[in-house]
Structures are given as C-alpha cells and as structure tokens.
C-alpha cells in the first residue's frame, strides 16, 4: 500500500496484523520503531520488497497472493494496473477531506467498516474523535487572532533541507484545529514545501513541532547539530518550546488511529493553561480501550510521547 498509515489502521481495526502480507518501507520503519510491532509482532513478517515509492513490482506482489490491495486514489495508473491484474483494488485518499485529519480517519474507518462489517467501528471512532475535536474547539475558539500562537511544523529536516507545511497539508489543519496559526500558511503549496532559515526568522514561530518524517529531536534544534543551520534566535528555541510529535501506531503528523490523541496533545502543548486538566497518558489509555478494546499500560502510553529516533527513517535498509 502506498498510503503509509494504512497498515497501522488495518492492524488496530482488526486488532491483528496477521492478514497484512505487504507494505511500503516507510510504513515498516514506523512499525518497527513504535508500539505497533509490540502489540502486533506479526506485522514485521510483512514484505516490503514489492513496492518502491509508488512503483509496484507486479510479479513480487503476485507472490504475496493478496485478497485485497489498498492503494492511493491519486495513483490512477497503479489502480488500473491492479484492476487489470485481477486484484480487488481499494482506493484510499489522504487528501480528499482537505487534510482534515479527524475527517480522514473517520472516513477511512467508515470504508473499512463497509468492507468488513463484522469489525464495524465507525460509530465508536467518529463519536470519540468528534467529541475530542469539539472539546478542543470549546477551549480555543475564543482566542483572538492577534493572540494565536504561531506554530512551525518541521516536516523533513537534513543538513541540506528544511521543509514545512504550506496552506494545503496536515500542518495547516492541525494549527487551525488547535486555535493556532501555521506560519507556513502563506505558502500556497500542496503538501510540504522547502524553506530557508531567513524565512523562519521572519516568521519567528512561538512553537516548533518536529514530525516523525525526520530523525531530529528538540535537542538537535537547541544545539544546532544538523548542518550549518542556526536556530538560536528563533522565539520557540529561546523559550524552549520545541517538541517532537508523538509516534503511536504510526507517525502522528498524518491522519491515523492516533489522530484524536494527537489533537489533544498539540492543543495542550500549545495552550497548557487551557488544557491543565487533560492527563494525556490517561486519555490515550481511555481512547484505545474504549474505542478499540486495546489495553495499554501507563508505560506504553507514555512511550507514544517519547518516540524513537529511528522511526524518522523512511526505509528499513
């Protein structure tokens, strides 16, 4: 599947990964370094060699003998290839809902519930995710524009590259959903876009959220350990407001089963005084237990918010 969060969504939806025979390398790298492989060790048996980026080796796929193949709805060519080869090919979109992570998760679960009605989780997921969204809105909707926190999502980061969310990607939705301002919203681009330090200094964000699509940790920003970038004058760095995003069942920047918890975590990190009563570890346990019947220990729950560096690598080589 070339929609990377989907294997984790399937595993949690079925409460089993035994039927997942293949996935892309970025999905496997996240699985290996997250709770997903601890809860469902059989996921590590899935093959990754049949897909490279968006290119599928049809011979290698045939060897896996899948009953159903999920693919990105944007990849029409692959959809045709799969259908022509006789597979039950199911198109899944990551951007049909304008990168609204809550709606994307709800619709993914709706689709899976239609395909596999005996595992129907539509109502439970939708009820919980919408209650979290509404609770956050109640607490942040009154924040005047002039007082909204300015947030910067560090999507990918290397010695030669900094990328963030423009106005049409998950970062824009997350920022709006927590009553903040995505500093990259002036960038009219779909998905991520490259920026330089001069631009970041101009924006001077109050908060920096580092995704798990790179291996950087807050200390790498505080200590300027990557390339020759100097972050020391940025407000978020001076105020020690640089955070690594959680890694639950998958990288939480995108839509996925962790989305309701990610929304709460982001809101609490940005506006701690408005979410003082929210115990994020307890909420995580409650969510997985009530919605999916999955019991997490306090330690497992807390680990979601202290992700491993290796999860930021997009290959398992």
Where are each of the predicted segments found?
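Structural recognition of the beta-strand scaffold that forms the well-ordered cores
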Residues: 1-2, 19-24, 68-72, 89-93, ...
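A short, structured surface patch at a secondary-structure boundary
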Residues: 2-62, 68, 73, 183
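Solvent-exposed loop/turn segments at secondary-structure junctions
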Residues: 4-7, 26-29, 68-70, 74-78, ...
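Extracellular/periplasmic catalytic domains that process cell-envelope and extracellular macromolecules
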Residues: 14-15, 62-63, 82-84, 143-147, ...
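Short acidic active-site motifs
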Residues: 56-57, 78, 195-199
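Extracytoplasmic substrate-binding proteins
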Residues: 78-160, 185, 237-238, 244-316
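Alpha-helical, coiled-coil/dimerization segments enriched in small aliphatic residues
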Residues: 164-191
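A contiguous binding-surface segment within folded domains or other stable secondary-structure elements
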Residues: 193-247
């Amino acid at each position: 599947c070339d929609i990377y969060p989907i294997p984790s969504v399937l595993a949690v939806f079925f409460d089993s990964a035994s039927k997942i025979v293949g996935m892309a390398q970025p999905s496997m790298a996240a699985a290996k370094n997250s709770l997903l492989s601890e809860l469902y060790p059989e996921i590590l048996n899935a093959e990754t060699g049949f897909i490279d980026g968006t290119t599928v080796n049809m011979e290698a796929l045939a060897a896996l003998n899948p009953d159903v193949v999920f693919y990105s709805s944007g990849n029409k060519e692959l959809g045709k290839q799969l259908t022509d080869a006789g597979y039950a090919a199911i198109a899944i979109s990551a951007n049909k809902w304008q990168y609204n992570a809550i709606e994307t998760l709800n619709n993914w679960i709706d689709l899976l519930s239609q395909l596999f009605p005996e595992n129907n989780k539509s109502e439970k997921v939708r009820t919980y995710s919408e209650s979290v969204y509404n609770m956050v809105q109640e607490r942040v909707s009154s924040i005047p524009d002039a007082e909204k926190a300015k947030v910067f999502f560090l999507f990918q980061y290397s010695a030669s590259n900094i990328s963030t969310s423009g106005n049409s990607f998950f970062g824009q939705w997350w920022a709006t959903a927590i009553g903040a301002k995505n500093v990259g919203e002036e960038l009219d681009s779909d998905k991520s876009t490259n920026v330089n330090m001069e631009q970041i200094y101009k924006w001077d964000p109050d908060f920096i959220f580092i995704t798990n699509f790179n291996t950087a940790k807050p200390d790498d920003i505080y200590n300027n350990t990557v390339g020759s970038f100097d972050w020391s004058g940025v407000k978020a760095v001076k105020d020690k407001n640089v955070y690594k995003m959680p890694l639950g069942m998958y990288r939480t920047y995108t839509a996925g089963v962790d989305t309701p918890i990610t929304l709460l975590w982001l809101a609490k990190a940005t506006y701690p005084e408005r979410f003082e009563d929210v115990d994020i570890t307890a909420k995580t346990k409650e969510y997985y237990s009530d919605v999916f019947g999955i019991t997490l220990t306090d330690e497992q729950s807390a680990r979601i918010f202290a992700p491993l560096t290796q999860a930021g690598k997009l290959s398992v080589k």
